[in-house]
């Protein structure tokens, strides 16, 4: 029986994780649930899975959760311990009973708790890209030092992990990640300045949170995945390729030195990579449709347009640069995406704000989680100023 902490239990990955647990009660027990402020959903999760600990974002949200549990009629003796704030997220993974952590909190808010789990030598199913994009060097050093298992949950890296099991890592020449191309794959460049947040949120394949959906529209998300792959699998950026695959059925490919290519192919259902991270090195039946190989189908593979989607190119450059560049990249992108979703800036201004933030922020090498969080904070402050200037129609010097 594995005991699990779910960081981000009310998000897409969190709810899918709990669905895997629901179908495999004999294998998994939920020890702690960490959420933001979706009280209705968290209350339902507490009633169903009976965790020992539940954590929310703030004291105000904690009061709402307390009232919700009272209204649900759950006897006080059956309540989990209720906590709030950053330190509580760390406590959720620190408990000795927890052996597996699913890291699915969006943004750097999940970094400290994930790093703590790694330092405690636990298995971490990583769905939070920002952990490695912002703190890859620090986190991977801790993985090696403390013997933690870091298993990717997102479909592309999970697919790469499966393919890499089939051969000798020293004989691998290249990793290839696939991308759907997003909603603007066929949109002329001349129309991109006028696209709306509603159009950008219309992802052709996956249902996800707003920020990651916009990042898919700009291909920034694929850039983050390139950075993440470099850290997870020890690849140089030049050895990680990206191809547009609109059907989103092939998730990743590994090219070996003899020219052979292994691909991981599956239905587009996040429960598969989540379950893989929980059951590895074993496999279990999954409640997802299998591919019918007798059915006629067409798969396309196309090169990405780096002029049309410059944030993907910028991600490669930041990973090559090292230091704090990828941390700045992530922070600035989050602020720019937020401004776009609010209708304050145009779609193309996302890249402009990220690029300008990178050019203005000094490069340094973070030596601790505190350093990473400080760089993130400074980058957000600058990016927000730049976004405000664009929203006001002024030019920054």
Curated annotation (Swiss-Prot):
- Please list the cofactors this protein needs: Mg(2+); Mn(2+)
What keywords would UniProt list here? Answer: Isoprene biosynthesis, Manganese, Metal-binding, NADP, Oxidoreductase
* List of residues binding NADPH: 10-13, 36, 38, 128, 130, 209
Q: Which reactions is this enzyme annotated as catalysing?
A: 2-C-methyl-D-erythritol 4-phosphate + NADP(+) = 1-deoxy-D-xylulose 5-phosphate + NADPH + H(+)
* Annotated residues for binding of 1-deoxy-D-xylulose 5-phosphate: 129, 155-156, 180, 203, 221-222, 225
State whether keyword Cell membrane applies. no
User: Which EC number(s) does UniProt give?
Assistant: 1.1.1.267
What domain of life is recorded for the organism? Bacteria
Cite the SUPFAM superfamilies for this sequence: 1-deoxy-D-xylulose-5-phosphate reductoisomerase, C-terminal domain (SSF69055), Glyceraldehyde-3-phosphate dehydrogenase-like, C-terminal domain (SSF55347), NAD(P)-binding Rossmann-fold domains (SSF51735)
Query: Which NCBIfam families does the entry link to?
Result: Dxr
Provide the function of this protein: Catalyzes the NADPH-dependent rearrangement and reduction of 1-deoxy-D-xylulose-5-phosphate (DXP) to 2-C-methyl-D-erythritol 4-phosphate (MEP).
Q: What is this protein called?
A: 1-deoxy-D-xylulose 5-phosphate reductoisomerase
Protein's organism: Solibacter usitatus (strain Ellin6076)
